[in-house]
Amino acid sequence: MNNTTSKKSSNFQQALWLGIGQFCTFAMTFVSAAILSRFLDKTEYGTYKQILYIYSTLVTLFLMGLPSAFSYFIPRLERGEQKAFINSLNRILVIIGAIISILLFVFSDLIARILENPELATGLKIAAPFPLLTLPCIGVEGIYTALRETKKLAVYHVVTKIFTLSCIITPVIIFGSNYKYAIYGWGMASFLIFLTAMYMKNKPYTKTEAIKVPNMYREIFTYSTPLLGAFIGGSLISMADQFFISRYYGTSVFADYSNGCLNIPFVIMVTTSIKNVLLPLFSKANADNNIESLLQTYNNAVNKSIVLLVPFITFCFIFSKDIMVFIYGEEYATSSIFFKCFIIRELVDILPYFSVLMALGMSRTYMNIHICGAIYMWLTGWMITSSNLPPYLIVVAGSLLQFAIRGYAVISIYRKHHIPLVNKEITKKMAIVIINCLLCGYLSFIISNLIPGNKVACINLILSGIIYYILLIPSGKIIRINYIESILQVIKKK
């Protein structure tokens, strides 16, 4: 890393600004889901979520890991070469967007028949042109993260997410309870964000002349092709529970599932931002044969994440029903079982193994893990539906798979490169914090239920949260875990 780059800001500050952008992304998901689930009935809302599911599945499948290529290549290239690289990747993204748009339109009727929802055909045809607008937007995050200008990226995320949210929910509120209005709003937002993203991607290089990189396309596909298998596997893993629940349990249950299976915004804000900051750092260090020097940075990030995030995850697990009712309304109280089964996987998301795997060039290992995982998920989903077992067991199977994937990745990295991503210190701290949080969480659950009065979800969550941290912070001092310091660090850095 050169001196100019190193002076721009600390890694934590970069992660913090990136985290703010991530928070806006997931906050928009939360708020839009909360509003639409109240204005649309379960069938309409389920159809809307199915369209998003099909769209996101195809995008993930066809991108072949290209978004991470921005963070991987840019730190390795000179300024002029970076501009040529971005232009090359933009052309690839436009082509992929066109392919996805054609597939959505042509196969909309077939997809609707497979998922046994005739209304899907109309919705998919309306949404078919959107990939042409949304895919070229990919890369803004990778560019500004690699250039260590994440403050600008945070502003971009805040503005675009607020605008997207307004475009999606306003037509539904004004014109009526129909999912098509939300799709139309999404399309309008996509067009304006496309213009903004193109400006953002070109802005750092307006005074830079592009320098052609020899065999650039070959380099891009050499990097991304091994990831293709991994992302196909990852897409199939993601598709499995959505497909089986959508097809065999109905649109209404799918609405419950889709509302329950969502990440906690604050947790994803932290874990994703750390991953995105570490990837270019590890990539540069690996190119300089100095990756061991970053292990302390990695360990510090993981230890801080454990103390900061495990209490949030535990609280959400214990008070899942109140959270679902508060966000979506009493009608979606049944989403709590899906939410509880889903968020346990966020405990292993604290380990940013992906950054290390990619920096070490272990994309083939990543591919093999996900292909095996896809086979497991589809076999498990088939067995659960064939046995008429409850749908939440499919989500449990998916969460267990995420634990297995992280475990295998950590072992593979250690065997091949002797890099211990999970040491005794991390394991011990994780175990102690989880036990401490569970004890305080269930005790606060019991105490809050003994308090007489109004059991409105919002009030119950506030009271329970206060009791939870009143118990957690002093007990943390006994076991030498400073929970309050981890929170104050985030506030002070802001």
Model-inferred region functions:
Residues N2-N3, V422, K428, G441-K494:
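Membrane-proximal transmembrane or re-entrant/amphipathic helices at the cytosolic face
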Residues Q13-T29, T160, G185-A197, K201, ...:
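Transmembrane helical elements of multi-pass membrane transporters/channels
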Residues S37-E44, L147-K152, I162-L195, S363-R364, ...:
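Membrane-interface helix-loop junctions in multi-pass transport and translocation proteins
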Residues S9-S71, G97-F105, F130, K161, ...:
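Signature of the first transmembrane helix
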Residues L133-Y156, I343-I375, W382:
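Membrane-interface junctions at transmembrane-helix termini in multi-pass inner-membrane proteins
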Residues R91-I232, M239, I344, S444-I446:
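Hydrophobic transmembrane helix module of multi-pass membrane transport proteins
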Residues M1-K7, N11, Y179-G185, L195-S238, ...:
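Interhelical loop/hinge segments that connect adjacent transmembrane helices in multipass membrane
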Residues A33-A34, L63-E78, A146, G260, ...:
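Helix-loop junctions and terminal segments of transmembrane helices
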